[in-house]
């Protein structure tokens, strides 16, 4: 191939689409495509990065499920900016076109998961849900085939930085909302499980250790997306050297119960 490491932007955008619609069908289809490619293609997987999110989704498929491109992009932007009823996400638009109604989105992982709004409202229950969503998405990323990348600040749940608006050279570019300097003062809390930073940092560190230690999470494992029978729960199965690892990821805020059609001893 031209490039041996590929930036997995489509999966990233499709992941956030899934967060907003609570429907994993498009994400499963995207993962099926990625997992069917030859092993020499290695993907760099991420939830957020330095750039904006452009909603480059498979609209031909979405149209079959009554999701038209223009109104769906508007919905996603309304949802993640917090302008849709029930959304706890926060962020800003970039390159907003008033004629075509098209726009791209900017925000950190933590703010998109609701950590910013929960902190502002000082709502403990909302914060617990937001942290669970943040960690679930990272666990899902660690299960994917490829190389997981954690963007600076995500390891401590860093939220949007609005101070860019005070800088004359930056205030016109909303992408700086997720390009803020690393909050070293907040990083001091990383070992305190009673803080947001501590809960996220300690759990991500645990995930990293498992990813590094377990061969089944390595590059030679067979990775497939599993049809769980529930459109709100994504299943990912890894198989290597006679062992199998199943990951279940609930893209709804409610508890779910599933039956695994497998035999054997589980741990």
Where are these regions (language model features)?
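Active-site and adjacent substrate-binding regions of carbohydrate-active enzymes
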Residues: 1-267
